[in-house]
C-alpha cells in the first residue's frame, strides 16, 4: 500500500467520529487534505457540518469539496479538529508546522473539545526532534530573536542549526499571517514540554510547532491496518 493510501485510510477512520451538526476544525497538509475530501463526500450525501480551516490552502480545498465554512469569529468553540502531524510521541505530543500553518492549527486545536491526529505509521516516534521544529517569527529584529531562541535551546539541553525556511525560488517562506519560519534541526528533544514553555515568551516568536497536550487520539495507518492510540 502506498504512503498516500495509508494517509487516506487514517482520514477515513477519523471521519467515523464526525456526527451531524458538528463544528469541525480542518487541518492542513497532505493527510488532512484527504480528510477534507472524504468529508466533502459525506456532505454531498447530506451530512450537516461546518468547518473552520487552518490555512488558505485548506480553505480552498474545502470550498472545492463543498464543505460549509465559518471562522472562529463566529464560533468560540469547536467540537472536533482533525489534523495531521510531522511527529507523534507516545504521550501524543506533536511536532507540526511542516506545511507552515502551525499558528492557525494551534489556535483551532486549542478551541476544540477534541483533537484527532491522523498520520501514517512513520510519524510515530519515541521522542520528538527528528523532524525540524518550526518556529514562526516576526521578520523584524530577526537576529535578536534568533539569539534568544539559541539561548533557550542551550537552557533546554538542545542545539542545532536554526535556518530560515525558504521557498523554491530562494526567498523566505511567508506564512498566511505574514510571518517567517525558523526550522530548528535539533535531533532528540529531551523534554518537549519544557522547551515549549521556554519558547512561548520570547519576543518575536509568534508560535512554535510543539503541540503539547492538545491531541486526544492518534490514528496511525500501517500495512496491518489502523492503530488507535489515546492519550494516557
Swiss-Prot record:
Pathway: Carbohydrate degradation; pentose phosphate pathway; D-ribose 5-phosphate from D-ribulose 5-phosphate (non-oxidative stage): step 1/1
List of residues binding substrate: 28-31, 83-86, 96-99, 123
Single biological process term from Gene Ontology: pentose-phosphate shunt, non-oxidative branch
Record EC number: 5.3.1.6
Catalyzed reactions per annotation: aldehydo-D-ribose 5-phosphate = D-ribulose 5-phosphate
Role according to the record: Catalyzes the reversible conversion of ribose-5-phosphate to ribulose 5-phosphate.
Protein name, UniProt field: Ribose-5-phosphate isomerase A
Amino acid at each position: 500500500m502506498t504512503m498516500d493510501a495509508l494517509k487516506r485510510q487514517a482520514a477515513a477512520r477519523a471521519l467515523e467520529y464526525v456526527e451531524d451538526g458538528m463544528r469541525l476544525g480542518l487541518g492542513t497538509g497532505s493527510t488532512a487534505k484527504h480528510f477534507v475530501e472524504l468529508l466533502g463526500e459525506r456532505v454531498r450525501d447530506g451530512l450537516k457540518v461546518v468547518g473552520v480551516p487552518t490555512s488558505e490552502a485548506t480553505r480552498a480545498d474545502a470550498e472545492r469539496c463543498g464543505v460549509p465554512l465559518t471562522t472562529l469569529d463566529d464560533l468560540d468553540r469547536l467540537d472536533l479538529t482533525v489534523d495531521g502531524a510531522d511527529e507523534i510521541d507516545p504521550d501524543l505530543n506533536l511536532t507540526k508546522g511542516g506545511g507552515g500553518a502551525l499558528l492557525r492549527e494551534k489556535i483551532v486545536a486549542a478551541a476544540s473539545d477534541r483533537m484527532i491526529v491522523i498520520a501514517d505509521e512513520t510519524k510515530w516516534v519515541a521522542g520528538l526532534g527528528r523532524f525540524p521544529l518550526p518556529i514562526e517569527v516576526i521578520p523584524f529584529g530577526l537576529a535578536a530573536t534568533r539569539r534568544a531562541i539559541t539561548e533557550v535551546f542551550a537552557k533546554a539541553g538542545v542545539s542545532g542549526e536554526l535556518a530560515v525556511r525558504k521557498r523554491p525560488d530562494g526567498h523566505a517562506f511567508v506564512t498566511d499571517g505574514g510571518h517567517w519560519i525558523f526550522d530548528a534541526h535539533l535531533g532528540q528533544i529531551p523534554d518537549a514540554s519544557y522547551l515549549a514553555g521556554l519558547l512561548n515568551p520570547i519576543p518575536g516568536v509568534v508560535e512554535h510547532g510543539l503541540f503539547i497536550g492538545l491531541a486526544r487520539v492518534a490514528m496511525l495507518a500501517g500495512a496491518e491496518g489502523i492503530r488507535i492510540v489515546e492519550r494516557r
